[in-house]
């Protein structure tokens, strides 16, 4: 529908698809409108990472933009990165638990970084799903290059003043 609009060049597309977010950002969508191909790219996203690992999200987004602007295809390491980001988002947002632990998952990462004292939610029944804390530990250990823990530690005192 966006590609068929006369205002398509004024419309920015964003993705919140945590199952495939890096690939969404890398993809140039080509849709036939009448007899002409119209191309449109998603210009932003990485919602899971923006919630807890913002510095890493910026770095990922810059890599994605550089690859997309080069226009020479998608390097294998970007597909590996895509799978890693998807794995991390699954740990935080809890699709295995029907997304019941989404807010608590974000809070848990922020608590581990020292930015929150606990993972309390407005609804006291909203908490981590069974095994979710272990999943968060697993992904932060498996992909230390995608977390901001050292950066947060370096600035925590300054930010909490």
Region locations from a protein language model:
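Catalytic alpha/beta core domains of metabolic enzymes, predominantly
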Residues: 1-102
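Long, low-complexity C-terminal extensions of enzymes
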Residues: 97-100, 109-161
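Conserved, mostly hydrophobic/aromatic
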Residues: 106
């Amino acid at each position: 529908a966006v590609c068929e609009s006369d205002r398509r060049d004024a419309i920015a597309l964003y993705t919140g698809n945590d199952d495939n977010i890096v690939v969404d950002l890398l993809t140039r969508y080509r849709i036939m409108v009448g007899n002409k191909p119209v191309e449109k790219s998603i210009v932003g996203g990485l919602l899971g990472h923006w919630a807890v690992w913002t510095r890493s999200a910026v770095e990922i987004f810059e890599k994605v933009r550089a690859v997309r602007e080069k226009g020479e295809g998608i390097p294998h390491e970007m597909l590996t990165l895509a799978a890693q980001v998807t794995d991390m988002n699954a740990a935080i947002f809890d699709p295995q638990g029907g997304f019941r632990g989404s807010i608590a998952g974000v809070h848990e990462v922020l608590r581990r970084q020292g930015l929150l004292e606990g993972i309390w939610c407005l609804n006291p029944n909203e908490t981590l799903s069974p095994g979710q804390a272990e999943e968060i530990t697993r992904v932060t250990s498996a992909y230390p290059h995608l977390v901001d823990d050292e950066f947060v530690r370096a600035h925590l005192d300054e930010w909490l003043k």
